[in-house]
UniProtKB/Swiss-Prot annotation:
Transfers the 4'-phosphopantetheine moiety from coenzyme A to a Ser of acyl-carrier-protein. The gene is acpS. It is found in: Cytoplasm. This is Holo-[acyl-carrier-protein] synthase. It is an enzyme of class 2 (transferase).
Length: 126
């Protein structure tokens, strides 16, 4: 196995909360997959959840080498959690297509947050 991509991103939670207050759920719908949006709707700390997902998807797009561009969208990345709470990243659409061309076999994702910031790192291995 070799590392074929590494990405990190940090998001300011307050900035995401302000974007939510300006645009409501439209901002969340732009970032979240359908399954993520269903979870989001049930939460009290929507801004914190969205900041963590935003950072994770930006980190994944950086690890892919495209950023959110070249046909890759936020909806190409879905974050879920296993039974122990470990974050899991699933690719679809253009991101999946590009990952297959790069022979990505393993995806590692870590997400963390504290009072003001959410941070995520993604590693793609062949």
């Amino acid at each position: 196995m070799a590392i074929v991509g590494l990405g990190t991103d940090i998001a300011e939670i307050e900035r995401v909360e302000k974007a939510l207050s300006r645009s409501g759920d439209a901002f969340a719908e732009r970032i979240l997959s359908q399954s993520e949006f269903e979870i989001y709707q049930e939460l009290k700390q929507k801004g914190r959840f969205l900041a963590k997902r935003f950072a994770a998807k930006e980190a994944a797009s950086k690890a892919l080498g495209t950023g959110i561009a070249h046909g890759v969208t936020f909806h190409d990345f879905t974050i879920s959690n296993d039974e122990n709470g470990k974050p899991m990243l699933t690719l679809s659409g253009k991101a999946l297509e590009l990952s297959q061309k790069s022979h990505i076999a393993n995806i590692h994702l870590t997400i963390s947050d504290e009072r003001h910031y959410a941070v995520a790192t993604v590693i793609f291995e062949s």
